[in-house]
């Protein structure tokens, strides 16, 4: 289609030439962490076939200012940014919010309270979610467990840790979590604990999957790639966290 194009990228500067997300089909691009956040320790993350470049930036209309290095020509499928944004805007409110939330996390920005989403979520799923209470310091789920569903924080706060128990994020009222494992069909890769006594709403895994199945292929593509991208960015961040209590 006129919105997608196979391209051969020979120079890293060409990656930033258009308002487009790039899906790698062959080759490797390297991202140094100092291009992402300030750190005195330097590590590099590889992006290869099956990964995307500038997807989060394109979806959120941010500057394409993360600097990649390529040592060999990179084969990509380029997808027009305006087409991607329109597809996501027309997605169901839950899928749209999942994508927006993931972009926020990729940029390591603090989640903001979202009362509009909360109202719509509570109204839309009032007969579907299961309520639960979790006491302070109790686990909500642990690494390796199969996903039960998406969790919405009605009251309280939680914190996330890596498999090595390095704490890396906190989430608060109106935030949600746990959707990544559902979308990527994997077991839990993080631990989540209650930071204080919490009231949670659990939206069953099958309901989330049903929402996703009704979306157009382009939205499904964005969903799978945005979580892959979040995982790659987390690997870059976690390389500085190992062993931190």
Where are these regions (language model features)?
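Cytosolic regulatory regions built on CNB/CRP/Popeye-like sensor folds
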Residues: 1-245
